[in-house]
Amino acid sequence: MEPYDDGFIEEQEEQEEERTEEKVINEEYKTWKKNAPFLYDMILSTALEWPTLTTQWLPDKQEVPDKPYSTHRLLLGTHTSSDAQNYLQIAHVQLPNPSAPNPDDYDEERGEIGGYGGSSKKAPMEIKFNIVQKIDHKGEVNKARYQPQNPNVIATMCTDGRVMIWDRSKHPSLPTGTVNPQMELLGHTKEGFGLSWSPHTAGHLVTGSEDKTVRLWDLTTYTKGNKALKPSRTYTHHSSIVNDVQYHPLHSSLIGTVSDDITLQILDIREAETTRAAASAEGQHRDAINAIAFNPAAETVLATGSADKSIGLWDLRNLKTKLHTLECHTDSVTSLSWHPFEESVLASASYDRKIMFWDLSRSGEEQTPDDAQDGPPELLFMHGGHTNRISDFSWNLNDPWVLCSAAEDNLLQVWKVADAIVGKDLEDVPTEELEA
């Protein structure tokens, strides 16, 4: 009798695990789909030709005269197979205008107008999505972000470490077959995903990469006739891959950086030191820190997302210990973004295929055992519409509670949580008053 082949058995076990996981994902998706009409006022799912690793709403919207919708713009990339051309893309999305409450939708039982998913008496309006501009890009687009002072100017992170600057108004709607950025920022030796424009100074940019460095760029030093630009400063304060960087939204000299070295570090660009940060937090997460987000309304509050599945909340004035920890994700937390209008609301995405909304004003609230089974008191909402890892998400600046989320399986979703879920009970508690 032949002995068992250990490799064969391992392979069989792995396949069985994959089948089980697939079954669980499908069951979860079926449940989500069944409940979706009660959870959302609007949801669009569209399959892109290629997956995108990046998505961001552009800050404008265009009203369409005599129509019940407006046109919003989305910034996307592509992640194609090795042979196919990649693109930086702009899409138009038609979103229904928020409607005034209709007395015909009055629900006597609940004493409310409308309900979960808005009015049940009106047919949902079809949401139209189409790509309106494709610009040839070298390799996949790891991340794309528009410049706040001029949204036509876009920075992209490339797979070879280059950062490219594009002025979309100088490119035709259809690709030309030639990669022709306005500038190339040369310095990183490996690819990266950390990218943040200064909201304070036009043309200032910070990037972080797998080469363990953080680099500052000043686009105003660009000279015509030479597309290549070198960094104005290079920081070597991290000992491993730099995953995310962000300019502080209220303090022009502060930049936050996070890394696989399990540290959160704060740079003060007024200081000449480039090998050490002005402030740092160590030992507070148990694994790599993937994401950082400064609260745009509470100047001392920031959040970090980690491969240890948790979200850390911090007070800039004391990084020795976290203010609070949020736990509910079942896999690595990969991106974070504060709500643009609700100071206490934070959104997080994870490899567990979920986007979660957290309302920090609920921190410390008592829960019944049944409530506790659904998650911690801060958990406001969980988006379960993706069956694959989420690569990026973005809040819409013109329509509160509208998000766009993109997953690794080509699926792009534009969605708005039902007002009945998030439209009330958001107490105006200053985020600084959070207790650990």
Swiss-Prot record:
A GO CC term assigned to this protein in UniProt: cytoplasm
Single biological process term from Gene Ontology: chromatin organization
Chief subcellular location: cytoplasm
Signal peptide interval: none
Pfam families reported in the protein's UniProt record: CAF1C_H4-bd (PF12265), WD40 (PF00400)
Extent of the WD repeats: 136-176, 187-227, 237-277, 284-324, 328-368, 385-425
Places the protein is found: Cytoplasm; Nucleus
Superkingdom per UniProt: Eukaryota
Alphabetically ordered keywords of this record: Chromatin regulator, Cytoplasm, Nucleus, Repeat, WD repeat
Record's compositionally biased regions (Acidic residues): 1-19
Cross-referenced InterPro entries: G-protein_beta_WD-40_rep, Histone-bd_RBBP4-like_N, WD40/YVTN_repeat-like_dom_sf, WD40_repeat_CS, WD40_repeat_dom_sf, WD40_rpt, WD_repeat_RBAP46/RBAP48/MSI1
Cysteine pairs bridged by disulfides in the record: none
Region (Disordered): 1-22
Function statement: Regulatory subunit of the histone acetylase B (HAT-B) complex. The complex acetylates 'Lys-12' of histone H4 which is required for telomeric silencing.
Subunit structure: Component of the HAT-B complex composed of at least hat1 and hat2. The HAT-B complex binds to histone H4 tail.
The protein, known as: Histone acetyltransferase type B subunit 2
